[in-house]
């Protein structure tokens, strides 16, 4: 789903709906963020996982020798991969809460995406959104944010943790504070994207990464 706002430097945010319910509460929360971004002049695209089966990463390393493309050829991964390669200015990932964590299919997609394309996502503002019936939201929120904080991506905050509550589709709209949090997130992301695009200093210098373990 693509949403068009008033274009400003062709800035765009990709939103990934990690729920198997394409039009459920996670989609509704992400749509609130997207509408706010559009009102701020930022174009948006929402890609939904839906009920598609998603292969997990097997650490084969082929993406490092294959032009940053995963060895598994599923349509969903390449749809997200192509959106990132075509150029985005920000990323929002949304998920329902299952057993205190994000949807497993979403994590499988993100594992592959960030392993193969972390350099393309570097310094892009990012945020996660979680929706739950009752509990586990903060644990799922923390899990998703780890992808961003390991990839040199600035986290966009809101007035509260980016979570909303609802069980049946559309019920999340009754969470007034949750919906306001989504709108604040959209405005804050638009602000950060503009500031980064208008900046004169450029990005920080990166050191060559060092990989160690607890043995050496």
Question: For each of these PLM feature ranges, what is it?
Answer:
Residues 65-160:
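Helix-loop-strand module that forms the ligand-binding subsite of alpha/beta enzymes
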Residues 1-10:
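Short, Lys/Arg-enriched N-terminal segments with co-localized hydrophobic residues
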Residues 12-40:
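N-terminal beta1-alpha1 ligand-phosphate binding loop
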Residues 39, 154-216:
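Glycine-rich phosphate/pyrophosphate-binding loop and the adjoining helix
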Residues 49-69, 168-171:
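N-terminal beta-loop-helix "entrance" segment that forms/cooperates
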